[in-house]
Amino acid sequence: MAPQAYDRDKALELALAQVEKSFGKGAVMRLGEEARQPISVIPTGSIALDVALGIGGLPRGRIVEIYGPESSGKTTVALHAVANAQAAGGVAAFIDAEHALDPDYARKLGVDTDALLVSQPDTGEQALEIADMLVRSGAIDIIVIDSVAALVPRAEIEGEMGDSHVGLQARLMSQALRKMTSALNNSGTTAIFINQLREKIGVMFGSPETTTGGKALKFYASVRLDVRRIETLKDGSDAVGNRTRVKVVKNKVSPPFKQAEFDILYGQGISKEGSLIDMGVEQGFIRKSGSWYTYEGDQLGQGKENARKFLLENTDVRDEIEKKIKEKLGIGADLTAEDAAEVPADF
């Protein structure tokens, strides 16, 4: 005979009390007991990308994968996130497995290189062990691993050049991500894995492109960003930067498949002013008539480059436009408790 309802309720309460005693308060909770907290984020440096992500930046306590072709802007996007985390008083770490971090370029993007924790590990195991220890300290706000392709297993480094090491890196990544996921959530650390593209042989239909390191990262990542260079920006005949498109191919904190376009200027990184002009025109705050840009009746300049220079020199106007865009779209630091209740916890 089935137990009565009150017997089941009593058994459940006893089980919950035992779980709480063994694993601590909050180990199990009813989802409706507390109001949902807004998802804390780290801005990316491009307001267009923050909007595409749906919550105003990269989610804290989650894994983010940034991948794309060579020289597409992957590390630039990651370094801007590092700079923004540091600007908010956070501590950042950079695992430079490629041994290719340029401190001068990072400094130009706003990164405090004196405070940045940098490691250049010898093996993939060492890199991921260092990352795991830093995350478990609870003192790191953002950690970047550059790149997954450079996380070479110890057996491969110590072996001969022609030796076969099938699946070693994939197993290494799978084990590391299993360990790190809960630690990231508990510490509120954002882990950015930069990844490279490879081509699968013999693919007849669909895209032959794939990322390195097996499938584990695809599953564990809450956000996956596909970064592509779509155009070269020129000043006369001189190349001054790239037009970059980022597609949010996976997003567990907001609806996916949105995309953003912004300018990356050589030696300067993401053009915040250029991104604000694009979003300002799109949202109706900036008016574009021919090649002229105007804001509330005042001319910003003829051509996007002149308008960008105007905003660079007049930071009060730039900040005002940014505030209006964020308020209209409900992203960033101005998110209210009412807005937060509508933010989905997981997609």
UniProtKB/Swiss-Prot annotation:
Molecular-function annotations in GO: ATP binding; ATP hydrolysis activity; ATP-dependent DNA damage sensor activity; damaged DNA binding; single-stranded DNA binding
Gene Ontology cellular component annotations, sorted alphabetically: cytosol
Record has ATP-binding as a keyword: yes
Coiled coil: none
Record localization: Cytoplasm
Record's keyword terms, sorted: ATP-binding, Cytoplasm, DNA damage, DNA recombination, DNA repair, DNA-binding, Nucleotide-binding, SOS response
Main location: cytoplasm
UniProt binding sites for ATP: 68-75
GO biological process, one term: DNA recombination
PROSITE patterns assigned: RECA_1, RECA_2, RECA_3
Role: Can catalyze the hydrolysis of ATP in the presence of single-stranded DNA, the ATP-dependent uptake of single-stranded DNA by duplex DNA, and the ATP-dependent hybridization of homologous single-stranded DNAs. It interacts with LexA causing its activation and leading to its autocatalytic cleavage.
PANTHER family named in the record: MITOCHONDRIAL DNA REPAIR PROTEIN RECA HOMOLOG-RELATED, RECA
Protein name: Protein RecA
Species of the source: Nocardia farcinica (strain IFM 10152)
